[in-house]
């Protein structure tokens, strides 16, 4: 049974190798020109896609400095209000009192309420069960 399954796969691999040797590559080497299209025709044909290697977006030509400038920084009046708002929101979330929405979420998520101080004493059975 194993030989039956492997034979078609091996034949397909051999066929792909033969096709690869006889056909030319779909990706020409960089710097080589396609003989079917002269250089003047490449630039004039608007329907032909732009080659990435010759475009200005090529990483060899483009850098962040070209887009934003060498010493670009965001102005403080854009950064400071957002930073202050986020800090105030985090402080409010930490310091606010528990609401009905918090109790509902705790019930939905199935969390157990925090134990009271007296159940944390080592001699109580509730504290013993919580540790094991």
Swiss-Prot record:
Residues 1-15 form the signal peptide. Residues 96-132 are mitochondrial intermembrane. GO terms for biological process: mitochondrial respiratory chain complex III assembly. The keyword Zinc does not apply. Keywords: Electron transport, Membrane, Mitochondrion, Mitochondrion inner membrane, Respiratory chain, Signal, Transmembrane, Transmembrane helix, Transport. Its main location: mitochondrion. Coiled coil: none annotated. The chain crosses the membrane at residues 79-95. Residues 24-73, 110-132 are annotated as: Disordered. Residues 32-50 have a biased composition (Basic and acidic residues). It is a single-pass type I membrane protein. Residues 16-78 are mitochondrial matrix. InterPro entries: UQCC4, UQCC4_vert. It is found in: Mitochondrion inner membrane. GO terms for cellular component: mitochondrial inner membrane. Forms a complex, named COMB/coordinator of mitochondrial CYTB biogenesis, composed of UQCC1, UQCC2, UQCC4, UQCC5 and UQCC6; stabilizes nascent cytochrome b/MT-CYB and promotes its membrane insertion. Forms a complex, named COMA, composed of UQCC1, UQCC2 and UQCC4; activates MT-CYB translation. Forms a complex, named COMC, composed of UQCC1, UQCC2; UQCC3 and UQCC4; mediates MT-CYB hemylation and association with the first nuclear-encoded complex III subunit UQCRQ. Complexes COMA and COMB are bound to the mitochondrion inner membrane by UQCC4. Belongs to the UQCC4 family. PANTHER family: PROTEIN CCSMST1, UBIQUINOL-CYTOCHROME-C REDUCTASE COMPLEX ASSEMBLY FACTOR 4. Required for the assembly and stability of the mitochondrial ubiquinol-cytochrome c reductase complex (complex III (CIII) or cytochrome b-c1 complex), a multisubunit transmembrane complex that is part of the mitochondrial electron transport chain (ETC) which drives oxidative phosphorylation. This is Ubiquinol-cytochrome c reductase complex assembly factor 4. The gene is UQCC4.
